[in-house]
Amino acid sequence: MKKLVLIFALIAAAAYFVSINKNHLKVEYISIGTQPTKALEVASFDAAAKPKNIILIIGDGTGLNQITLSRIASGGPDHRLAIDQMPFFGNSLTHSYNNIYTDSAASATSWATGIKTKNKFLSITPDGKAIPEILSNKGYISGLVATSSITHATPAAFYAHIDSRYKEKEIASQLLESPIKLSLGGGLEFFDIEKVKESNLLITDMNDLDGDKFLKAKKVLGLFDEDGINRSSSKPTQLQMTKAALNWLSSKANLNSCNGFFLMSEGSQIDWASHDNDAATMVVEFKDFDQTIAMAMDFVTSNKETLLLVTADHETGGLQILSQKNDTVKVQWGTGSHTSIPVGVYAYGPGAHVFTGLMDNTDIHYMILDAIESSGLKPLVCSN
């Protein structure tokens, strides 16, 4: 009888392992890259220096192993990415209000409002204000960039207040009523286009991101795909949209004597590739993300009143980097969903030195506001 029980137990365990291995423990081999490191100029900042501007770059689903694999795939283990060259580093906890597992809505709400919420909820908090709303009467102008739809969970947390991230048509309506002046991403299908045109310059062609009409517009909504932006030569990358956004925001802030600007830019599809357990596509998406960081670091070096922060909402896929075989590395995915692994926080610019050690994702909200001394800013509407 004991032997029979043991046999059944072994069969059940084997069946369970096969099921798990088939569905979650996907193995891939990624080539080790040979690109040389591009060393970036990194300036030093006095500890007492304060920023005027904030750039927050998000790698959706980007854990430390997504970064490690991308580093190896670019130039090997000794290669250095742009993100590796940011001088200050910490770790962030990511859990939501009632679950160790977070989704993008809850995590982005933590940055946007400084308060934890339940998964799927967007910035439903006691005082209901996200960073762009807080800063809108403090002389700031704000913009958003995403390679997802601009109504997707992460960007939406910075302007929408709603009980479900999936109500994207309602979220789109809230964007039009928000203080966000520049939005670049996908999501055309969720908007009432006639209503958009009442108060925005609508852009659907990436070639219009550097024209005079774009730079002179008072409010811009760029929608470059029906939902998330498909990667192709006719569609803008995170790098291209973020560069255009920085040109627009810095120009408007200078022309209108604003106190500064706030920009959130998300590389959304690192997460999507990780959900699909597709390491090769993840590396492609990360390359765009890292090039965006490099460009933003150059901006900070040249415009020394800007603080650059880079982090992630959560890790996706439970990615593991296991071994090397000739000129490839073996990687394995543990899940098709998110994990509760802490994520990195990287900082460069005035005020960057405080973003070290272990922090909660809600802390980032308050640290941003403290960095620009928002509590001491006098009421001012930055009209462009």
Stretches with model-predicted labels:
Residues 203-244:
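Functional beta-strand-loop-alpha-helix junction segments that form "active/interaction loops"
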Residues 282-298, 330-343:
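Gly/Ser/Thr-rich active-site loops/lids in small-molecule metabolic enzymes
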Residues 153-158, 226-229, 245-246, 250, ...:
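Active-site His/acidic residue clusters
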Residues 19-187, 192, 197-213, 218, ...:
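N-terminal catalytic scaffold of extracellular/periplasmic and nuclease hydrolases
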Residues 64, 289-326:
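Metal-dependent active-site segment of extracytoplasmic phospho-/sulfohydrolases and closely related
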Residues 56, 184, 222-224, 262-266, ...:
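Structural motif
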Residues 225, 265-269, 274, 286, ...:
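Active-site proximal loops enriched in glycine and acidic residues that flank catalytic Cys/His/Asp
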